[in-house]
Amino acid sequence: MFLVNAPPLASFQTKWAPFGQTTACRIPVSFSESEEDISRATISTQVQGIISTLQSDESSLEVTVEHEGIMQKTRKGDFNIERGLKTNAAVLKGHTRESATLVVPAEFRDNKDDHSEFGPLMLESDSDDSVDRDIEEAIQEYLKKKDTGEASNEGLNTTSSTSVEHGVLLNDAQNFAAANTCPVSMVTTSDICNSFRLKEQQRSSSPVSVSSDDSFEQSIKAEIEQFLNDKKQQKSKSKISSPPKVPCIETQSKPKLKTSKTSEKQNSKQAGSELLRKHASDSKLLRPSPETTKIQPKACVLKQNTKTSSPSPKSTPIVKEEPSDSSSDDGIEEAIQLYQLEKRRQGITPTVTPEKVKSPTSANSLTHFESRKRKSLNNKLAASQDISNCQPLLSKRPVLSEEDSFSKREIGAPTTCRAETAAELMCAEAILDISKTILPSQPQSTYVIPTEPPPPPPEPQCDSDSLVDSDDSIEQEIRTFLARKAQVEGAGISPVKLETTIETSPELGSQSSKLSLTHKRKAKAMQSDLMRKTLPLDKLGSNVELNQYPQPDERLQSSGKFAAKLSAPSEIHMGAGESIVIPEVSTALNRGRGRSHGLTRSYSSGDKSSSLDSDEDLDTAIKDLLKSKRKYKKRPKDGKSQCKKRVRFDETISKPVEISEDSKQPPKDPPFIKSCLLNSSTAKENSLEKSKKRREEKAVERNIPSCSSSPQGNKDGQPMPACASNEPNSKTRALDDAHESSSVDSDDGIEQEIRKFLAERAKVSSALTAAQNEAVSDSNIEKNTQTLKQEQAVLLNPVPETALQPEPCANISTAATAQASVVQLLALHSGKQSLLPVRLFNTRPVEVRTGMSPQSTPNCFIIKKECLVEQNSIIKPIEQCLPTAPGRVITQANLNSPQNFPVAGNFVAGLKYVSGTEKQLLLNVGHTGPSKLATEICKSMVHNSRLANCPPLDRKGPALERSKELPAISIIPKSPLVRSGLYLLTTKVCKENSPSLCLPINTTAYKTGINLMSIQYCQVNTQKPPCVGELSVNQPKSAESRVSVPGHATNPPLFVTRSREFKAAREGVEREGRTNLNKAASHDLVADSVKKVKEIKNSQESKNV
């Protein structure tokens, strides 16, 4: 702004560039730049261009890294997805790779199921964002080229996706490098395990730092060939016994996943790998040396050995489903294959550590130096990460055998020391390809069978479309594993049988492999229980033993067999038996599928072919899965819900049969309905075991007597369970019910609660109808309009008043006298009632018809005793009495304004809000002079000793009492208004000594005033007695009668509040005698009240005049 008036030359015209990029600030003509400045500007521009590209990549990659961190925490064995996706982000951004490639610790795996299905997809979007569209296109083009080019090394990989990936990485790196002037040497490591692949990607400092000349690719190819030759020469030299079998199963699963994933994901991953290769090639071009190439074969062999746990004829066949279009380098592929075969035969592991290759090579430029630092750090981290990541391939968990992990750690130590030469980079590049070729065989070959309960059988090749292993290798693996398992278990299990079943039903294998350990064990226990209880041991045969440690295929197969066997002994299970048994066994299986389907999709080989190294691993995995299971109970997945539907349908089919068989048992349909409606995680967890026991016992009891019934069918036409299958059927049903109750509460307690609730609702509805009928009957009450006609004209203007729900317990016929009548009412009501809509009442005095015998429940009682109120005098209510009794709310009518009684919906809401308080409401309505009806609660509520502060007043009128039994109150006709209802007259808090009418209301929940529109409830003192003092009868001149007495005694508004503090008062009232109202006294009462009202009016008018 300050330069607006300055000449244009003075203003600095800066070129705005992306974040972090320092642009050359050229000051126009008036300023001269030195050559140094110009050269610096160009250099800084180049450097900043690289930095800006890195930052642009970082912006998206940081998001991916954060997401990956979350996914790593949330995902439980989904190492394949994590690694493949991590590689995407890691390749683009090497330094962020550190956080991205962290191995998921065991404690975080429980949550993995939640995101296993979605993690890879979500990360794909991040990786796509990290790679520009141009880069993707370049990658695709390069893939086409690479098919005939470098990818030949990759072609040996287990899956085309991995090989293509590396080729794409190189091409992508070149594409990036083309845009960047400063080449950066990158260190790449072979994907011995996908963990090593992660290492490689971690080390890639940035795609920008790679030079993009095609000569790099050629040089890389040449160096790879040279490396292969050197490797062949040094094979004999690098003979070291390979560590114990450490099948990097996950590596195979990753390629499979990659092939199954979208091409974008592959492209991004490939781009990352290409970048790594380009970095390697750059460094190689800088420093090619045969020495390092010689060293590198050792590293390659070591990595290969670590990956290919042991030389087994099973794993030897390297099946290349898709040579990843990189079939041009046949010589290299052949050399790699030969090397692998020889290595496997010899079981040799070269001593050279792969991390040597990993270390960055020194570059001439600063960018090379920085990238090398970054790489070295990444390499160190990646070394440890690779070690941990390689084993999780085996056991879904980063558990390495001590030897393997130790050797890898040793390898990881000298990471940055020896990687200074370009030959090492060449070795790393070659190791990439070689490791890829080695990977497919490893999952086939080795399965570490723990000495203790064997893990689920390895079936790494069954699920994915990109299977590298041939059928023979799979068969061999299955046979060997089954044989070992049979030896371990000591059970005579025929491996051939299982082999055939597994081979014949790859779908079952895939599904079962998707099951988590918890579900596997659960299904196993269920099956074993069912078989033991339902089938004779001879029928169970080896399947029971087999299921002691259920294997995915075996379990599925055995579950089908179980269903068949359960239905076989008796043809009764046709509709209910099989449908229930199969869902029962499949309940856990399908839940496992629904839960871990996507998860095992991601780490199919890791889960299927992986075997836990020890019982500790198994136990920890089970614990983690149990945690995840609880989480999944809260939100069941599709597979789980389908299984539930199936089970529930089966139960609904079979339940009527059981009920018809044994009518003693109540129908169990309501629990299922409740299970649909109610879902309490805590209750379900607590009730799982109880419901299992209960339902099992009930089902057994229900089905045992039904054994005598004809097994062919019942009157409903549905098959009835026979004795042979009744118990198993009931058992399975009980288990199904238990599973349902695990997700939703279906306890009998819930059913009882629902029934209670329905009963209460019915009671409430009946009470409402009764109250309405009362209102209709009371509408016939005669109106004594003549005696109160003048008064009505002067005092009783029509006032809108709230009609709350009439209390069902108080069916008391009353006469609504004019404002002269004062009633003190304590409506004790413990039931919950809904409020009726607001009504407008024209307040008119009404008389009670003779012969009306009201009925009331024991909760309602009327207060006895009175306090004398002198005319034109104000006696403040006694608030000092009964410190233990609840306090009062005193309201006052503003008699000077026409809006004295805005008793409308808002007021109803206020009453409703107040009605939420605990017990009762004490109400004193009306105003009189020395009236007989000015009442007070004394003995009825509390002991006399506590009422010392109450003024001793003579009873001028009848006492309203009630017996201990609290029977229906019988009120003599023409008695004053004594009705269980609320008659609010006022809208303001009445001050002490105010000349207007005061209305005390007892509520216990309010210690402060609550303004609800025009009503304010004031809690005087929660500890004060419910004694109601005298009402002031003085009113201002303009005060017309604003007292709203319900002209329709039919629907007096009821103000119900509930308070435990009235319990004592209620007990005191129960000690009182029955109400005895004298008819004559009531007549006098009404006449006196009317008289008093007139006198008060006249006196007020005279005073005003």
Curated annotation (Swiss-Prot):
Q: Where is the composition biased (Basic and acidic residues)?
A: 275-285, 686-701, 733-742
Keywords of the record = Nucleus, Protein phosphatase inhibitor
**Where does the record place Low complexity bias?**
306-317, 602-612
Q: Which GO terms describe its cellular component?
A: nucleolus
Region: Disordered; residue ranges are 228-382, 444-468, 504-526, 589-748
Q: Where is the composition biased (Pro residues)?
A: 451-460
Q: What is its main location?
A: nucleus
Give the Basic residues compositional bias ranges. Answer: 628-647
Q: Where is the composition biased (Polar residues)?
A: 359-368, 504-516, 705-715
Compartments where found: Nucleus, Nucleolus
Q: Name one GO molecular function term.
A: protein phosphatase inhibitor activity
Q: What does this protein do?
A: May inhibit phosphatase activity of protein phosphatase 1 (PP1) complexes. May positively regulate cell proliferation.
Q: What is this protein called?
A: Protein phosphatase 1 regulatory subunit 26
- Species of the source: Xenopus laevis
